[in-house]
A protein has these predicted regions:
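Short beta-strand-to-loop elements that line the ligand-binding cleft
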Residues: 59-67, 86, 133, 153-165
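Central regulatory/effector-binding core of bacterial HTH transcription factors
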Residues: 29-89
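Extended ligand-binding regions for polar small-molecule ligands
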Residues: 2, 50-53, 124, 205-235
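Ligand-binding cleft/hinge of the Venus flytrap
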Residues: 49-56, 125, 140-155
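Secondary-structure junction motif
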Residues: 86, 129-152, 218-225
Length: 235
C-alpha cells in the first residue's frame, strides 16, 4: 500500500510538472476567448470557466454569445478561440470538432397550456403553437429556416433577444421555447413545464460540440475543452 500511494504521488507530481512546463511555454497565449450559444442555459459552462480560472489565473477569459452562424463567423475570422455550438453541417477538417454530448430536445410551455399536462410532446403537436426562438434581429430568418426546414418545427415563429425574455413570453402564453439539455438545466419555476420533444416514440436529440481552428489550437483550449467535457458528462 505504501509503494502504491508513493508511486501514485510521484505520477501526480510528474503530471503537474508536465502541465506547468507546457503552460510556461505558452505564456504569450494568455487570453482565452470563448463563444457560446445565445440559447444556452446549462450550468456546466460557468462551472468550467470558474475551474479554469482557478487553475490558470494568468489567463484572461473573454466570453461572448451569439447564434450558431454568428459564432461560426467569429471563429472563422479570428474573433474567438473556441465556440460551444450545435452541429448543423458536416464536420470540417480545418477545425477540431470536440464532441461533448448528444442532447435531448425539450419544449418549455406555460402550465396553462393543456399540453403541459402530458409527459412528453410530439413535434406535430407543437406545430399548432408559435415557436419562440432566441436570436439577434439580424439572424432571425436564418434561425427560422433551420428550425422549420431542418428540425421540422412548423407553425409560426416569434423571437426573443435572450432566454429571460423568451421565458417571459412562454409564461404569457405566447408560444413554446425549444431548448436542449446541454448538461444540467436550471429549474423553470412554477409557471413553466419542460417536456421532452418526440418524433413518434423517440425523443429528438442533437449534437453539441466545442469547435476550434486546428492551426490556432493551444494547451489552454484543450484544457478548457477537457474540463467542460468532464462536467457535462459528469465523469
Amino acid at each position: 500500500e505504501y509503494f502504491y500511494n508513493r508511486g501514485k504521488g510521484l505520477l501526480d507530481e510528474a503530471d503537474a510538472l508536465c502541465r506547468e512546463t507546457i503552460r510556461l511555454g505558452q505564456d504569450d497565449e494568455s487570453t482565452l476567448r470563448i463563444g457560446y450559444l445565445r440559447c444556452y442555459s446549462g450550468q456546466e459552462l460557468y462551472q468550467a470557466v470558474a475551474e479554469f480560472s482557478r487553475l490558470y489565473p494568468e489567463v484572461s477569459i473573454h466570453i461572448v454569445n451569439g447564434t450558431h452562424e454568428e459564432l461560426y463567423d467569429l471563429l472563422r475570422f479570428g474573433g474567438v478561440d473556441v465556440i460551444l455550438s450545435d452541429q448543423r453541417r458536416a464536420f470540417s477538417e480545418e477545425y477540431v470538432n470536440f464532441q461533448l454530448l448528444s442532447c435531448g430536445c425539450y419544449a418549455e410551455l406555460s402550465v396553462q397550456n393543456p399540453l403541459s399536462a402530458e409527459q412528453s410532446v410530439q413535434l406535430e403537436e407543437l406545430k399548432r403553437l408559435p415557436c419562440i426562438l432566441i436570436s439577434s434581429r439580424e439572424q432571425q430568418n436564418v434561425e427560422q429556416d433551420y428550425y422549420k426546414n431542418t428540425l421540422g418545427f412548423g407553425g409560426s415563429f416569434l423571437f426573443a433577444e435572450n432566454l429571460e425574455e423568451g421565458r417571459l413570453m412562454v409564461v404569457g402564453g405566447r408560444g413554446f421555447l425549444p431548448i436542449e439539455s446541454i448538461g444540467t438545466l436550471p429549474p423553470v419555476g412554477a409557471s413553466i413545464r419542460r417536456l421532452p420533444v418526440c418524433r413518434g416514440d423517440r425523443q429528438i436529440f442533437r449534437n453539441y460540440c466545442l469547435f476550434w481552428n486546428k492551426e490556432h489550437g493551444n494547451y489552454y483550449i484543450e484544457e478548457f475543452a477537457g474540463l467542460l467535457k468532464k462536467l457535462i458528462r459528469r465523469e
